[in-house]
Amino acid sequence: MAFANAAEAAQKIAYVNTAQVFQALPQREVVLQKMQKDFKSKADELKSIQAQAKTKIEKLQRDGELLGQEEIEKLRIDIAKLDSEYKVKAQALEKASARREAEEKAKLFKTIQDAVKKVADKKGYDLVIDISALQYGKPEYNISEDVIKALK
């Protein structure tokens, strides 16, 4: 008897390919471009430090035999300082970029979750599972395209 009740109360289930929806998000490209713009000055600063170090290394290699010991030592110290500065700033940029990327992704995934809920409510689904947790699902239960449309 308990089985009959469970069968009668069958839930309507769908699945969504969140990765596919994420790739199709129009906001994703906008966020990516904004992040590149926001971090451009720091990336340019790193390129400048690299160029300065390269110039000094080339001078040391090219003119090393013509330079006095004091000049050689000064160039080596300058190169070491530039290398250290580069490493510190590159690490800071990497951390800031990764943190910002995580924040932006979280916002985008929240947008996707809201769209999934909207589509599920509209179509009467009781449960929506991400495709990554699914062994098999009939294509007609895939609501990914509906979610993508809801986001545009």
Short names for language-model regions:
Residues 9-131:
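Amphipathic alpha-helical segments
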